[in-house]
């Protein structure tokens, strides 16, 4: 599946979540908060959200903070709550830091959808592109193949506060220890 198709599917699923009947009301409003604005990954996601919203006849848009800062995401979510959106989608920079504001959104009847945050508590739905375990193991196998299954390695994640990034790393490390120690 291409990234463009993936963003279209994810946008469609997110928009479908806001309607219990499956039919979209013209007053459906979805705000999506990215980790950071202006980077290719989230630019493509934004294009998919806008395209799918147009097809469905609903209002949907993405907000991208200027830096990968949880406080900026909290502020963006507060703004979406004040705007009275139907649903909020978010790719958390810090899952724990967002819990209070996501709880606030849900208490106001706003549907909350997350991505890359499998253990997030105050959500109606979290989605992932792939199994964290299999993703980590696949990358571990690539590393083992390139290094002949020997040597030392370092692990980097996008952020220590993003649960999914750490799940990928934990899976890779466990796989390497089990199969190449």
Regions found by a protein language model. Name each.
Residues 3-11, 23-181:
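A residue-level marker of the well-folded mature domains of exported/periplasmic proteins
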Residues 19-20:
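N-terminal signal peptide c-region/cleavage motif recognized by signal peptidases
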């Amino acid at each position: 599946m291409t990234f463009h198709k993936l963003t279209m599917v994810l946008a469609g699923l997110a928009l479908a979540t806001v309607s219990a009947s499956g039919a979209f009301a013209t007053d459906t409003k979805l705000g999506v908060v990215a980790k950071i604005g202006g980077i290719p990954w989230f630019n493509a996601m934004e294009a998919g959200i806008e395209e799918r919203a147009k097809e469905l006849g609903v209002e949907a848009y993405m907000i991208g903070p200027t830096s990968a800062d949880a406080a900026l995401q909290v502020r963006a979510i507060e703004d979406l709550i004040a705007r009275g959106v139907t649903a909020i989608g978010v790719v958390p920079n810090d899952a724990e830091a967002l819990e209070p504001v996501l709880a606030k959104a849900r208490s106001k009847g706003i549907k909350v959808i997350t991505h890359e945050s499998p253990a997030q508590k105050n959500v109606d739905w979290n989605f992932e592109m792939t199994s964290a375990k299999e993703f980590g193991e696949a990358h571990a196998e690539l590393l083992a193949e390139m290094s002949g299954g020997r040597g030392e390695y370092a692990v980097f994640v996008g952020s220590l506060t993003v649960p999914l990034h750490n799940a990928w790393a934990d899976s890779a490390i466990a796989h390497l220890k089990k199969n190449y120690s």
